[in-house]
Amino acid sequence: MIIDQGRDPRLQLDDAEPFRIDSAEVTRDIERSTLTNIILDGDAFSLPVGARVTLWTGSNVVFVGKAVDEHHVLDLLSTETDDELTGDEVI
C-alpha cells in the first residue's frame, strides 16, 4: 500500500515530533509487515538504524516498527517481545 500526499503522511522517529514526508510504502503479509520507500523532498530518506518509527496519516497511526537498516522498517510484532518494550507498552 502506497501512502502518498493525499493521505497527509508524517513520520515520527522515537519520541520526536512527527514530520511530513512525500510518501512511503507499507507491505503486509502473514509473517511480517514492512515500511519502505520513504521519500522526503523527492529523495529517499535514511533512517537511524534501531529507531522506533511511526507512520501517521492525519491523526491515525498506520504503522509502528523498528528501523532494521537505513531504508527498511520491520513491524514491532516481528522485532520485539513484551520484555523488550519500555514502560507500559504491550504487544
Over which residues does each language-model region extend?
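Juxtamembrane "anchor/assembly" segments of surface/extracellular structural proteins
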Residues: M1-V49, D75-I91
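Short beta-strand and beta-hairpin "edge-sheet" elements
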Residues: T54-E89
